[in-house]
Regions:
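Basic/polar N-terminal segments that are highly enriched at the extreme N-terminus
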Residues: 1-9, 337-341
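Flexible "cap/lid" subdomain of the alpha/beta-hydrolase fold that forms the substrate-access gate
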Residues: 2-6, 17-18, 30, 66-102, ...
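Conserved beta-strand scaffold positions in the cores of enzyme catalytic domains, especially
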Residues: 8-10, 58-60, 306-308
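A short loop-to-beta-strand scaffold at the N-terminal edge of the catalytic core in hydrolase folds
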Residues: 13-23
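Conserved HGGG/HGGXW glycine-rich cap/lid loop of the alpha/beta-hydrolase fold
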Residues: 21-71, 90, 104
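Active-site helix-initiating loop/hinge in glycosyltransferases
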Residues: 36, 79, 105, 318-319
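Signature tryptophan residues that serve as conserved aromatic anchors
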Residues: 37, 41-44, 106, 112, ...
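Catalytic active-site module of serine/aspartate enzymes centered on a nucleophile-bearing elbow/loop
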Residues: 301-341
Length: 341
C-alpha cells in the first residue's frame, strides 16, 4: 500500500481466512468497512486514514471470494450467513465486542444482517447505496421496482434483470468478466451522471443482451481517473485475474437462503441502532431517491438518518470528502461518545 499509515494483516481460523487493512490506534473504537462487488478492501482507501485520524481503529477486510481472503468453489459458500460469521470472527480476533459497521454494495446486506441478527456487536451502522431489504432476496426487491421506468412486460425484474441473468446463465454471465478483468473494471468504475435519470439502468438490459451486448469481453474504454488511479486499478486486476469472478458473482446466487436467514433476525427484523443511509443520486440500479426501494428500511429502522450525495454507485471513491463528512457529522449526533476522547 502506498499509505504508510495502513497496515496489511491476515487472520485465520478453521473456517476462513480474512485479509484486512488496518489503520489507527489499536485501542481506539473499531470501525469496519465492508466492500461490495467486485471490489477489495482497497475500495476504502479514502476512508481508512481519515477515520484513523479521528482516533478510530479502522479496518477493511477483503470479503470472502476476493483478494487475499478465502475463495470458495460452491455458490452456497457465499450466503450472507457465512459472511456475517466471517465478520463476527474478525471482531473477536480484534478482541472487541462492538464496532461501527459501514457497508457498500454487497457489503450492505452483510452490515444490515449483523445489525438485525447481532445488534449487541454494533455501536451503529452506516450503509452506502443499498438500503435495508435486499438481503431478503430478489423476489422481495422486485416489489419495489418503479414501473414507470421499468414496464413489467419489458423488464419483469426491473433494474434487477441482471440478477436473473446470473441465475439463468451463470457461466455465460461470468465468462466475459474473466476474459479481461482490466477492461471490465474500466467499463464499470465510472462517475455518476444526471443524464441517466428516469431511464432504465444498464443492468436492466443484461438478461436479454448479456453484460456487453454479446461481446466476449468488456469494451476497451479509458479509465475514469475520478474513480481510480492506474496503480489502484492494477491491484484490483491482479486479484480478479488470480481468483476469477466465480466468487464475486456467487454472492448473487443465494436469494432463497438469504431470505431464510433474514427471517431469523431478532425483533421482527427491526433495527433500533443508530443508522445512517447515504443514497447516491446517480446510482440508477440502487435507485433510492425517487423510487420506493428504501421504504422497508424506513419502516424497520427506528433511528434512521438519510442523506443524498450527488454521486454514482462508487460513492466512496467519487465523493470521499462528502462521504467522510456525512459519516462524521452523523457520528457527532448519534455516537458522540466515540468521538469525545
Amino acid at each position: 500500500m502506498a499509505c504508510a499509515d495502513i497496515e496489511e494483516k491476515t487472520y485465520s481460523n478453521k473456517r476462513h481466512t480474512s485479509f484486512y487493512l488496518s489503520a489507527g490506534p489499536v485501542d481506539g473504537p473499531v470501525i469496519i468497512f465492508l466492500h461490495g462487488w467486485p471490489e477489495l478492501s482497497l475500495s476504502w482507501r479514502h476512508q481508512l486514514p481519515f477515520f484513523a485520524g479521528l482516533g478510530f481503529h479502522a479496518i477493511a477486510p477483503d470479503m470472502r471470494g476476493y483478494g487475499r481472503s478465502s475463495v470458495y468453489e460452491k455458490h452456497e459458500d457465499y450466503r450472507l450467513e457465512e459472511s456475517v460469521q466471517d465478520m463476527l470472527d474478525l471482531l473477536d480476533h480484534l478482541s472487541v465486542k462492538q464496532a461501527v459497521w459501514i457497508g457498500h454494495d454487497w457489503g450492505c446486506p452483510v452490515v444490515w444482517s449483523i445489525a438485525s441478527h447481532h445488534p449487541d456487536r454494533c455501536y451503529g451502522v452506516v450503509n452506502l447505496c443499498v438500503p435495508y431489504g435486499l438481503e431478503r432476496g430478489l423476489e422481495f426487491v422486485i416489489k419495489y421496482v418503479d414501473r414507470n421506468v421499468y414496464p413489467v412486460n419489458d423488464f419483469p425484474a426491473g433494474q434487477w434483470e441482471y440478477m436473473r441473468h446470473y441465475e439463468e446463465n451463470f457461466e455465460g454471465a461470468t465468462r466475459p468478466m474473466d476474459a479481461n478483468p482490466d477492461t471490465m473494471l474500466r467499463a464499470i468504475f465510472r462517475c455518476g451522471s444526471p443524464e441517466g435519470q428516469n431511464q432504465p439502468a444498464m443492468t436492466a438490459y443484461v438478461r436479454k443482451q448479456g453484460w456487453f451486448g454479446g461481446l466476449t469481453e468488456a469494451p476497451d474504454v479509458p479509465r475514469d481517473d475520478n474513480i481510480i488511479t492506474q496503480e489502484e486499478l492494477s491491484i484490483y486486476v491482479t486479484y480478479l485475474r488470480r481468483n476469477g469472478f466465480f466468487g464475486p458473482n456467487s454472492w448473487y446466487m443465494n436469494h432463497e437462503s438469504n431470505l431464510d436467514y433474514s427471517m431469523k433476525a431478532l425483533n421482527a427484523r427491526r433495527i433500533d441502532l443508530p443508522t445512517l443511509f447515504l443514497s447516491a443520486r446517480y446510482d440508477y440500479t440502487c435507485e433510492t431517491v425517487t423510487s420506493r426501494l428504501a421504504e422497508p428500511m424506513r419502516e424497520l429502522c427506528s433511528d434512521l438518518t438519510e442523506q443524498i450525495i450527488d454521486a454514482g454507485h462508487w460513492i466512496a471513491q467519487e465523493k470521499p470528502v462528502q462521504v467522510n463528512r456525512a459519516i462524521t457529522q452523523w457520528m457527532f449526533k448519534a455516537l458522540p461518545e466515540l468521538l469525545t476522547d
